[in-house]
Amino acid sequence: MNEPTVENGKLVRRNESGTLTQVALIYSPGYGGGFSSWDTKYPGCIYCPELALGILNGGTNLHEIVERLFPGLYADWESGLRVEWVELGKPYYLHEYDGSEWIVTDFPIA
């Protein structure tokens, strides 16, 4: 798998032959206010490439990134953000319970 790149406003990965295969999704597994699910002002924050790269690179500047890109964000993101790589074109669901989020990709489609 090649290094992630930003394409069409999302952080993505390509396989060795150059085919686009995965997209990065950001979520907050801690309880409180779900990062990608609670604030309706920033519905696309789940795909933010700059924040996803910050998380993948150790998270040392996440506070600055979130404050700059999402001022006034209503979410409990400081308890920890995670990136999950999802296969391109695969349906997913961002599940949330009491602010704790997780990505579900294995579910029946009727």
What is the predicted function of each stretch?
Residues N2-A110:
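Catalytic phosphate/metal-binding cores of nucleic-acid and nucleotide-processing enzymes, i.e., regions
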